[in-house]
Structure formats: structure tokens, C-alpha cells
From Swiss-Prot:
Keywords: ATP synthesis, CF(0), Chloroplast, Hydrogen ion transport, Ion transport, Membrane, Plastid, Thylakoid, Transmembrane, Transmembrane helix, Transport
One Gene Ontology term of the molecular function aspect: proton-transporting ATP synthase activity, rotational mechanism
Organism encoding this protein: Manihot esculenta
Places the protein is found: Plastid, Chloroplast thylakoid membrane
PROSITE patterns for the chain: ATPASE_A
Record-given protein name: ATP synthase subunit a, chloroplastic
NCBIfam families associated with the record: ATP_synt_6_or_A
Classification of source organism: Eukaryota, Viridiplantae, Streptophyta, Embryophyta, Tracheophyta
Any one annotated GO CC term: chloroplast thylakoid membrane
Recorded coiled-coil stretches: none
Length: 249
């Protein structure tokens, strides 16, 4: 019994030491000109883009009138993105389908790649590879692109009259309406970053403590929530664009 108790205590302490070694925010930098960029984010982003482009090329290289296989899957995804865009934007959704689709697919594949691909096999001088959406710089960039998109949508439809929304329904709300333009990208970026980072940290901690079958259900739950986060981001992006074009809250 004493030997068994000592073994359990040793395993528990080893798990706790492993948890204490989990590092967050370690980056491998490239120097480009006078700037430092997060190399691991660029590497994993290129991998995600390659997966998307490669899958699309393979799926539609021989398009058929009656779609099958990969073509059928991509057409289903396109219909899904069109439905989301039309629901949130309205009848003028057409030009925005590529933007909403790009956001959804990039985030979805990034999240799943972080959960499924064995990034830790690739050793870096500092830090480690992870999902692109596990880095706050990526999520902030996606949120800023969304902000630029809905500003462009509003200005292209209403011209300078777009700015009248800041004093509607009363000029008293001007500060709040201006603040809203800052809170939208903040909420988009931190929601996505926080959920993906938390999911990966939970899996790492569980694997350190119980490296058997216990973390597997959590990993499947992470895959589900990763897809939901991609859908939430794309839906909110489309809703913001539709709101800027229609001028209602």
C-alpha cells in the first residue's frame, strides 16, 4: 500500500510539474525589415491556406453537372454560407458571400487544425506551433478586416450620409455610438482568441494529468466549439455589414 501510495503521489506531482511548465505567449520571431513578426502564426496560416486552396482545387478540378464527392461537399458549404449571408445582410448579400465565406472557412480550418494536426512534432527555437486563431494578433486582424468591411459597406451605399447613424435616434447617443465601433472588433477578437486558447490549455492540462482516454471527450467537445466559434464570427460579421447598410440596430 505504501508503494502504491508513493507511486500515485509521484504521478500526481509529475502531472503538476508538467502543468507548471505549460507556457503561454512564447513566440518565435522573424525579422522582416525593421519589424518583428510572429513566425509560427505565419507558418500555420500558410498551412491553413494551403489546405483550403488544395481542397478546393481537388474538389472542382473536374466539375460535373450533377455534383458528387468533394464538389458536392463544397457546394453544400457554399449554400450554407449564402444562407447565413442572406439571413444577416438581406437581399444585397451577393457581393459579401466571398468575404463571409473566407472568414468562416479560415477560422473553421484554423481551429480544427489546432486540435487535429500534431504541431508539436515541429520544433522551433522558441515557442511552439499552434492554431493561427490561438494568437491574439490573428483574431484582432480578422476583427479589423470586419470593421473595414462594414464601414465600406455603409459608405458605398449611403455615402457621407452613413455618418448620420451616430446621432440617431438622438444626438445624445453620439459617444455611445462611437464607442460601439471600438467594442465590436474587441468583442469579436477576444471572444475567438479566448475560446480557442482556453480549449487548447484545458487539453494540455488534462493530458499532463491523465494521459489516457480522459482528455478525448474534451478534445471532441473542443472540435464542436471550434466550429461554433467560426459560425459565430461569420454570423456577427455578416450582421454588422447588414446593419451598416440598413442603418438600424
Amino acid at each position: 500500500m505504501n508503494v502504491l501510495s508513493c507511486s500515485i503521489n509521484t504521478l500526481t506531482l509529475r502531472g503538476l510539474y508538467d502543468i507548471s511548465g505549460v507556457e503561454v505567449g512564447q513566440h518565435f520571431y522573424w525579422k522582416i525589415g525593421g519589424f518583428q513578426v510572429h513566425a509560427q502564426v505565419l507558418i500555420t496560416s500558410w498551412v491553413v491556406i494551403a489546405i483550403l486552396l488544395g481542397s478546393a482545387i481537388v474538389a472542382v478540378r473536374n466539375p460535373q453537372t450533377i455534383p458528387t464527392g468533394g464538389q458536392n461537399f463544397f457546394e453544400y458549404v457554399l449554400e450554407f454560407i449564402r444562407d447565413v449571408s442572406k439571413t444577416q445582410i438581406g437581399e444585397e448579400y451577393g457581393p459579401w458571400v466571398p468575404f463571409i465565406g473566407t472568414m468562416f472557412l479560415f477560422i473553421f480550418v484554423s481551429n480544427w487544425a489546432g486540435a487535429l494536426l500534431p504541431w508539436k512534432i515541429i520544433q522551433l527555437p522558441h515557442g511552439e506551433l499552434a492554431a493561427p486563431t490561438n494568437d491574439i494578433n490573428t483574431t484582432v486582424a480578422l476583427a479589423l478586416l470586419t470593421s473595414i468591411a462594414y464601414f465600406y459597406a455603409g459608405l458605398s451605399k449611403k455615402g457621407l450620409g452613413y455618418f448620420s447613424k451616430y446621432i440617431q435616434p438622438t444626438p445624445i447617443l453620439l459617444p455611445i455610438n462611437i464607442l460601439e465601433d471600438f467594442t465590436k472588433p474587441l468583442s469579436l477578437s477576444f471572444r475567438l482568441f479566448g475560446n480557442i486558447l482556453a480549449d487548447e490549455l484545458v487539453v494540455v492540462v488534462l493530458v499532463s494529468l491523465v494521459p489516457s482516454v480522459v482528455p478525448i471527450p474534451v478534445m471532441f467537445l473542443g472540435l464542436f466549439t471550434s466550429g461554433i466559434q467560426a459560425l459565430i464570427f461569420a454570423t456577427l460579421a455578416a450582421a454588422y455589414i447588414g446593419e451598416s447598410m440598413e442603418g438600424h440596430h
